[in-house]
Amino acid sequence: CVERGVSRNQSNVGFVVGEVMRLLANRIHYDVLTKTFVTLGGRSMKIASVMSKRDQVRRKEVQQHLLDEMEAECKQKIEAQYPQVAVLDLVPSYYVLDGKEQDEAPSPDQRAALVEAHYVAFVGKKELEQKVVDSFIRTPKHIEHAYVRPEALLYALASEEDLRKGCAILDLGAQTTTLSIFKGNQYLYTKVVSQGGYDVSRDIEQLGISLPYAERLKCQYGCASVEQVRVNNAFRVPEPSAAEGYVLVKATDLAAIISSRLEQILSPLMSDLNQYADRISVLYITGGGSMLNGMEEYIQQQTTVP
């Protein structure tokens, strides 16, 4: 019912979600879990910068209702410009009060005439959010909050000290690769590349083997670079077009294919990451792709971030 992160059948997804929550409740000794938190992501998710400006004529308090209005305006701006997308989340980036920039939201005692609010907007196809909602309608569960994946990973992985000093998260997913850089209360940089581990497997498939075998070879024997191959083993893989035929795949050939796609995906992200190296103290690598043999070493060779 879910294929590479895409919901194909909402009714089946609803049943599976309900069953997973039942098993989880049993595991943690709860009678029932009534609330759920979900993360949203995928190839359709994009990042956009948006801002709103207000002239209060004279210096006076920047009240919360004004900030709420500015946030709502930013959301409307994006959805008016791109009717096919929905704003999945709107995260404050920074504020400008009378020409002075600050990371934190204005405090009750701050006064300003000219107020700017800058946001990072996570947007995706409208059906992305709707399919999640439809799936949960078929379960007696309530979605308490939907997080975009970069924000959820930030809360899950980074400590308060990391947030204060600055941190980066590289999420190596199946269909997308996302780099997020965060410091204080501000996203310094966020970019989603619509390629991931699935694209690596499709490249390996071009050797004349099936996609499931390509995925298995990548996960069990693949390396992030040819230099990391210690023994150039050869793997006999069944050929889909011949009942008794097989394809011989060398470990170095496998690594070369993987490395080529990784370079295409990661080179621009690593270049951008290095521009922020002096502003962050730690880089987290997560997602299924992070488990590829030699991935940590591969990343370390391309960046000066710890």
How would you name each of these model-derived features?
Residues 243-306:
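C-terminal structural cap/anchor segments
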Residues 160-226:
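Acidic, glycine-rich loop-and-beta core segments that form the ion-binding/anion-interacting portion
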Residues 1-36, 40-167, 188, 210, ...:
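Nucleotide/phosphate-binding catalytic cleft detector across ATP-hydrolyzing
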Residues 38, 136, 171, 204, ...:
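Residue-level signature of catalytic and energy-coupling elements of molecular machines
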Residues 9-20, 128, 196, 200, ...:
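Helical mechanochemical/support elements of P-loop NTPase systems and associated helical scaffolds
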Residues 47-50, 179, 295-296:
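Short glycine-/acidic-enriched loop or helix-start segments at secondary-structure transitions
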Residues 73, 131-135, 156, 203, ...:
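Alpha-helical scaffold segments in soluble metabolic enzymes
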